[in-house]
């Protein structure tokens, strides 16, 4: 298959590709979730959820592996690291809870509403769900071994936040020899609009490719696969 993308089209075999859904949790996409409580704007996430759902449906129909990430830690936050970890100092979730102690145990804690995937994007049989304790989906997870065992080397990214966990995972994948593509209208930034633009610029210039949901879905549709193989 040939996917139209920036800065140039990229060939990818559906059997060796995975659609990555990054952190589509209440924490990042819902009012009352961590990002919202930390002061980030989540008002524009509804169309992102719709676009991701469309990409997931198309990927499943084409036989592309769907992988969901969930970012967070145990309820005691041992996995978050203590003061000896830079994560303790830089995580906005941890900083928000230190400022508002009544939120302790409620933000990004496994088993809580904040940690849960949004209702619209629920895994189905055959999908893979991976818990991750840091921005990158490759850090302290089984992602790399799962992908290699399945012969997957092309990763199509969706999710939140483009400039944090999406970009971090794609960058790490680049260093592990994975081809990374971001569907720009199925991602959303944490912060101002320029954060989205900067992340996409970095990706398409240095680490991967950028496409969109319409192009992706049309590319992997059965009719498109038949025409490209003819």
From Swiss-Prot:
Q: Which residues form a coiled coil?
A: none
GO biological process terms on file: nitrogen utilization; uracil catabolic process
Q: Which cysteines are joined by disulfide bonds?
A: none
This enzyme catalyses: (Z)-3-ureidoacrylate + H2O + H(+) = (Z)-3-aminoacrylate + NH4(+) + CO2; (Z)-3-ureidoacrylate + H2O = (Z)-3-aminoacrylate + carbamate + H(+); (Z)-2-methylureidoacrylate + H2O + H(+) = (Z)-2-methylaminoacrylate + NH4(+) + CO2
Q: Does the keyword GTP-binding apply?
A: no
Gene3D superfamilies membership: Isochorismatase-like (3.40.50.850)
Enzyme class, UniProt record, top EC level: hydrolase
Q: What is its EC number?
A: 3.5.1.110
Q: Which UniProt keywords apply?
A: Hydrolase
The record's InterPro entries line, in alphabetical order, gives: Isochorismatase-like_dom, Isochorismatase-like_hydrls, Isochorismatase-like_sf, RutB
Q: Name one GO molecular function term.
A: hydrolase activity, acting on carbon-nitrogen (but not peptide) bonds, in linear amides
Question: Does the keyword Hydrolase feature in the UniProt annotation?
Answer: yes
The residues responsible for catalysis, as annotated, are 23, 132, 165
Record-stated family: Belongs to the isochorismatase family. RutB subfamily.
Give the protein's function: Hydrolyzes ureidoacrylate to form aminoacrylate and carbamate. The carbamate hydrolyzes spontaneously, thereby releasing one of the nitrogen atoms of the pyrimidine ring as ammonia and one of its carbon atoms as CO2.
Q: What is this protein called?
A: Ureidoacrylate amidohydrolase RutB
